[in-house]
Amino acid sequence: MNLPRAERPRSTPQRSLRDSDGEDGKIDVLGEEEDEDEVEDEEEEASQKFLEQSLQPGLQVARWGGVALPREHIEGGGPSDPSEFGTEFRAPPRSAAASEDARQPAKPPYSYIALITMAILQSPHKRLTLSGICAFISGRFPYYRRKFPAWQNSIRHNLSLNDCFVKIPREPGHPGKGTYWSLDPASQDMFDNGSFLRRRKRFKRHQLTPGAHLPHPFPLPAAHAALHNPRPGPLLGAPALPQPVPGAYPNTAPGRRPYALLHPHPPRYLLLSAPAYAGAPKKAEGADLATPGTLPVLQPSLGPQPWEEGKGLASPPGGGCISFSIESIMQGVRGAGTGAAQSLSPTAWSYCPLLQRPSSLSDNFAATAAASGGGLRQRLRSHQGRGAGRAPVGRVGAAAVSGGGRGL
């Protein structure tokens, strides 16, 4: 295979230039011509090497950065895929998002409750405002520093919804915006072994009974305690009055009580029945109302009413003792069938402002007896005679009744 030889460069005519002396001189532009034999030998060696490389099966080696390329790529004009160059020329693809993620700090593995607890525990007074908690978290963790406005509402919601955080109002001498937040003392151990990565369980504050944990600086008054006590207490120092004995009031209509209660508890204060008070003479009403500070209808426990004597009311068994006398008030009922209440102790008169002293009661009884007619006077006189030989207390009561009778 004969290859065309490289053409010799044509010799250009030599230019004549004038010397400085004015003489024409010849300048050699091409220089010395190389030997033609040496050039021909080099061309033959290059052609032989080219033939040897073309006859080899497989890959054809080409000088392209020291990398062997397939033959078809050389004939086609170069590689179509840049990945076929090799590892030296392969550049790893890097996007802008990947580079930005590499620079962004990782999110801490702590919950918002753990972050708030960290902030409160590191403060000197163990309390912080919402802005102080956010400042601690932003300064401690760069992740939250970059996303500050987004998680502030989450901190606020966790403070309000979890019982382990307690709101403390500001003191008057410390003005400022926002209230303080602190930890409930019972929630100090809600994290396992002091690690903020895991909580034991959700803390729940126990609801206390209102007023149970607050000590009373002063004892409650006796009247207030008696109103709220379901059982009668020792307000007046006297035992509870028994129920009326069946048969003691034979003429009492069914559904009608012989006395009315002033208090829902067992009878301490007894009132006259409404029909009996309506039938009392007007003179007795004037005598009762004239006494200041007393109630006209307030009387100790009464047996059969004196003005009902004419209606055929049987006298109580055990003698002709009248149940509303001074003696029955001071000493109580002598027999079991009288139906009167037990006597009140002397301390009862000091505790009860509504009850009158025995002396004032005797005056009211005397006025009521004067209005009831002559039959009542005879009963009082007979009772005075029988009470002369009884106990000293009975004599005092009888004397009081007799004194009222003389005034009549």
Curated annotation (Swiss-Prot):
Places the protein is found: Nucleus
Q: Name one GO molecular function term.
A: DNA-binding transcription factor activity, RNA polymerase II-specific
Q: Which residues form a coiled coil?
A: none
One GO BP annotation of this record: anatomical structure morphogenesis
Where does the record place the region Disordered?
1-54, 71-104, 385-408
Q: Name one GO cellular component term.
A: nucleus
Question: Main subcellular localization, coarse class?
Answer: nucleus
Stored InterPro entries: Fork_head_dom, FOX_domain-containing, TF_fork_head_CS_1, TF_fork_head_CS_2, WH-like_DNA-bd_sf, WH_DNA-bd_sf
Q: Acidic residues: which segments have biased composition?
A: 30-45
Q: Residue ranges under compositional bias (Low complexity)?
A: 389-401
| DNA-binding region positions on the chain | 107-201
Taxonomy, superkingdom: Eukaryota
Q: Residue ranges under compositional bias (Basic and acidic residues)?
A: 1-29
Show the SUPFAM superfamilies listed in the entry.
Answer: Winged helix' DNA-binding domain (SSF46785)
Q: Which UniProt keywords apply?
A: DNA-binding, Nucleus, Transcription, Transcription regulation
A family per Pfam = Forkhead
The protein depicted here goes by the name Forkhead box protein D4-like 1
Q: What is the species listed in this Swiss-Prot or TrEMBL entry? A: Homo sapiens
